[in-house]
Every structure is written in structure tokens, then in C-alpha cells.
Amino acid sequence: RVLSESLSGGWEALLDRRVDLIVAAGEGPSGGGYVAEPIGTLRFVFAVASTHPLASAGVLGAAELAEHRAIAVADSARRLLPRTVGLLSGRDVLTVPDMRTKLLLQLAGAGYGFLPEPYARGALQDGRLREVQVETHKPDETFYLAWRPGEEGEALGWWRRALRSEGLFDSWLHALAATYRSVAAGQSPR
């Protein structure tokens, strides 16, 4: 069984025993109960539609951002404290269920936010999105492979070996970059 979770939701699924293995962004909650190995990092860019009022702005601070809507992916955690990434509190935020919806809304000019650079790359190259500099920089996000120790059967061992394969994370980033074309064309990404 494969689940899709976001932000703290993957860690919560592991701790609640709904899954045996996760690939998750950011460090897990304190208290452990799991083993986590970094598998790669992902760069994010702050982007707006080329038609958005912020597209031609200089370096953006909190005051400029306060006048516009942020678009953010919702944390799927049910029990853990929800995690927010790159948001200033008290702002108008449209929360969406997934990164695909976030990209589509940002392409439509409905708001701003950080996007994975490989995912935004095609739209940046064809001019539909513009990268804008912000005072509050988002550091690269580390991704982890994590599991509960002592519960390692043959299937979990196989998946751990497969997901540690050299070059796999880079292949995922390449595939992420390729999904933009299908999203922009209104197709479901594969």
C-alpha cells in the first residue's frame, strides 16, 4: 500500500504505524522511534505568474507580501503539530491539497509561494512564472528515508535497498521537472 502525505503527515503515518517506510521532506519529530537517513536535497524558488503584480518587483519583504495571497500545500498531519514552510503568520493564505494544485494556481496568478525548482523550471524557462527574490530565504530541503527499527522484514529490506539506489533521488528530480509540461497541458502527471 502506498500513501501520499505532505509535510509532517508522512512522519505521523510512520509513527502511527500506517506505513512501514517513508520518503519525507524535513526532519522528523523529536522523540524518535525511527531511523532516518538523508537521501538528497531539493532547492525551492519563490515564484509568481509573469502577470502577477509582484513579478516585476525587486527584493520582496513582509510588507509587500502582506498585500497579496500566499498559496501553500496543506500539512496532512492529523495529530502532530502542522508544519508550515515559507509562510509569514497572519497572511492571506490559500491552502491547497497538493503541489500540482499549487503550481496551477500560481501559474494562473492567484498567489505566490515557494515551489520546488525542478517543478517550476519549465514555467520559468517559458516565461509563465518569474522567480522573485525575497528577504526571507528558504533553505534547501533535505529529504529522508525513514523506518521503525526492529521491524525489518524482507519486503522492507528490499524497499530500503531500492530507495537508496545511487542516482534515484536525482532521477526523481528529473521526473519532477518533466511533470511541468503535463501539468501545464492540463494532463495528469505520471
Cite the ranges covered by each PLM segment.
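C-terminal regulatory
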Residues: 29-110, 115-140, 157, 161-190
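A short beta-strand structural signal in non-transmembrane regions
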Residues: 143-147
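Residue-level signal for short, function-critical loop segments
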Residues: 50, 149-151
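Short, structured helix-loop boundary elements
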Residues: 4, 153-156
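Intrinsically disordered, low-complexity regions enriched in Ser/Pro/Gly/Gln/His and often acidic
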Residues: 140, 151-152
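Short alpha-helical
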Residues: 8-9, 21, 100, 119, ...
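Central regulatory/effector-binding core of bacterial HTH transcription factors
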Residues: 1-30, 178-182, 187-188
